[in-house]
Amino acid sequence: MKLIKSTTIVHSASRNFKEALDLCIESADKADIDIKNVLPVNEKDIDKVIGKKESDLILVIGGDGTMIRTIANLIDNEIPLLGINIGRLGFLTDLNVDSISKVLPEVFSGNYQLEKRPSLSIQVDDSESLIGINEVVFHSGTVAKMLNFSIFQEEKLISKHKSDGVIVSSATGSSGYFFSGGGPIIYPTEEIFAILPMFSQSSSSNPLILPNQKKIKIKLKNSVKASIVVDGREDFEVYQGSEIIISKNKSSYSLIHPPGYDYFEACRTKLSWGQPLINLDD
C-alpha cells in the first residue's frame, strides 16, 4: 500500500482524548510524518480547514459518534480515515490507546488494508439533502402513536405499513441500530439499502435488502407528526404527505484498517455475534 507521509488528527470534543493524541503525535514524529492539522470534531467549516486530499490519512480519536461525524463532514475531501477508540463500543474504530504505539508505525509504512464504503443521501421534500453513514430512522417520536406510510423503489410500490416507523440502513449501519432491531449483519462494502419496519401491525414485515442503484421513497399517509433521525444526530419533523427520498450518495469514503484486521472478528468480539450460549469446546 501507499506510504503515509502526512496526517491530520481529528479528536472528540467531549471525551478525554489527550493521552491518545500525545501517542499519535509521538508516533508521527518518530516516523517523520507531517502533521497538517490537529482539530476538534466540532471545528467550524472543518471541511474547508482541511483541504481536499491535503493529507494521506485522517486519524480520528473518539468513539463511533466522532467517527461518523468526521466521515460525514469530510466525505468530499477524499482522505481515508483510521479510528482510535476512546469511547465504548467503537465498532468503526480499530485501534485503542494501548495499540497506538505498536500499530501506527506499521500503518505509516504502508502496511494496512484500504476499504471503500458507500454512504446515504437523504432528502425530505425539497429540502437540502443530508449525508448518512449508518442509517435514517423514520418514526413517530411519540409513544403508542403509529404511522401509516408507504415504501417505494423509485415509483414502484414495495409495501404499505402501519407501524412505529422504519429503519433504512447502509451496509455499514447494519451492525448498529438496524441490528438491534432484529436486522441481519451485512458486509460493510455492499452496495445496498437495508429496510426494517419497526413494530409493524403485520406478521410479515421482514427486513428487505435492495441494491442501492435505485432510490427508496417513504411517503407519510396519516396526519400524525413524525420525525427522521440521521445517524442519531440530525432530527427533522415530517408531516402528512411528506416524502423522504433515500439514495446512494455520490461520494463514498475509505477506511484504513491495521494489518490483520478481520471484520468478522470485530463482529464476534464487539457484538458477541454468533457466540454460543454454552462452551462448545468442552
Where is each model-derived feature located?
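ATP/nucleoside-binding phosphotransfer catalytic cores, i.e., glycine-rich phosphate-binding loops
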Residues: 130, 138, 143, 154-157, ...
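ATP/NTP phosphate-donor binding region
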Residues: 1-57, 61, 97-113, 123-130
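Gly/Ser/Thr-rich active-site loops/lids in small-molecule metabolic enzymes
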Residues: 160-163, 167-204
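N-terminal glycine-rich "phosphate-gripper" loop used for MgATP/nucleotide binding
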Residues: 60-64, 71-74
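Short glycine-rich anion-binding loops that position phosphate/pyrophosphate groups of nucleotides
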Residues: 63-66, 89, 172-174
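Proline-centered loop/turn at the N-terminus of a beta-strand
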Residues: 78-80
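Short glycine/serine/threonine-rich phosphate/pyrophosphate-binding segments
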Residues: 17-18, 66-70, 175-180
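Catalytic core of DAGKc-family lipid kinases
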Residues: 89-164
